[in-house]
Amino acid sequence: MNNSTLWENIFSQKEWGKYPSENLIRFIAKNFYNVKDRSKINILELGLGTGANLWFCAKEGFSVSGIEWSKTGVERFKQRLENENLSHHIQEIKIGDYEQKLDEY
């Protein structure tokens, strides 16, 4: 089973990752509390899963990009941002191998 199939099976079987990492929340609060225009800062996440961390970053006003193996994970992330009127924060989301896709950034 390749990585793409593995992660597709994981994300298509149940709901995953609704809440962001506590470490990310602390990091953003500590380092970006006083930044007035966060939309000029692009956050790139490798292995975004269903996008809980990028959702938080978009909600905080950052532009977001990511790479993920699972098409289902990406679809759930995009749907969540669309449902919450945050999809305008998405710069680029790619599906596939990190090593290959990272060169495209």
Q: What annotation goes with each model-predicted range?
A:
Residues 63-68:
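Conserved SAM-binding motif I beta-strand of class I
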Residues 1-49:
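Conserved class I S-adenosyl-L-methionine
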Residues 100-105:
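A short acidic, Gly/Pro-enriched loop at the edge of an enzyme's catalytic core
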Residues 77-78:
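Conserved SAM-binding loop
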Residues 70-72:
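Conserved SAM/SAH-binding beta-strand->alpha-helix loop
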